[in-house]
Amino acid sequence: MVFRNNSNVTQEDHGPRYDWDEEEKNDILGYFFWGYVITQIPGGRLSEKLGAKIVVGTGLLSASILTLLTPVAAHMGYLWLVVARFCLGVSLGIHWPSTPPIATKWIAPADTATFMSHMTASSLGVAVTLPVCGYLIAYWGWASVFYVTGSIALTWSLCWFYLIYDSPEEHPRISTTEKEKLRLEIKPVNTSLKKPPIPWMKMLTSGPVWSVIMGNTCAGCTFFVAFNQLPTYMSHVLHFNIKANGLFSSLPYLGKKCSLC
């Protein structure tokens, strides 16, 4: 989304300009999602095996570095930027599937709905970031967006490694009382029990399962088309300046957050 805003800038004082056609711009945006898809299933399994702390933390750290290096990749050429975007998608694709393994050890069943609503409403971050990025581009150039957001993400990734642990038992800084409270509220999963076979045929021939798949697919496609193309529409069709573009492009994400509160 950050790059989408940057690619709409046409004024010279906003930073270097690159002679990419529309197909190349869409490739730069699209390859992020190819990388994002690849790590969805492996991300969850890696978190179960290695722990979400190291898996998510590594993804955050690598994504931060890639964000900081994005202006350099753009200067080096189109293919370098495509590779950087693809790797960024790989790094960030592990986050959502890595959440359940750690959440089941920290979040009590009574708080699960609240926790998931906040996770789903993470679009608040987009709603805040878009207007800020618009002003950053207007005053300091498009590269400043990557340096500022990359630096914030880098700081957060270091905080993640320091603050987050895979289970209450591993955390050295919470009290015994809190550990006992979590132990009583969260029932541990008995991994020694024999797992029943997965009913693949029943799942693949189930109408409700396919309804959920199709619903999520259509919603996801619609969301990400708007996610990528809304700033372009604001710029090329409505002719908003970069500050107004960021502000108005953020409104759908603010509405999404409000609807989930």
Model-derived segments and spans:
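Conserved MFS/SLC helix-loop-helix module at the cytosolic interface between two early adjacent transmembrane helices
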Residues: 38-79
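Short hydrophobic/alpha-helical segments at membrane-entry points of transmembrane helices
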Residues: 77-85, 211-212
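Cytoplasmic helix-loop-helix junction between adjacent transmembrane helices
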Residues: 82-123
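Central cavity-lining transmembrane alpha-helices of secondary-active solute carriers
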Residues: 27-45, 250-261
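Glycine-rich segments within core transmembrane alpha-helices of 12-TM secondary carriers
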Residues: 111-139, 144-153, 252-260
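Extracytoplasmic gate region of multi-pass secondary transporters
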Residues: 204-260
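Central mid-sequence intracellular linker of multi-pass
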Residues: 109-114, 137-205
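Extracellular/periplasmic helix-loop-helix junction of adjacent transmembrane segments
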Residues: 1-37
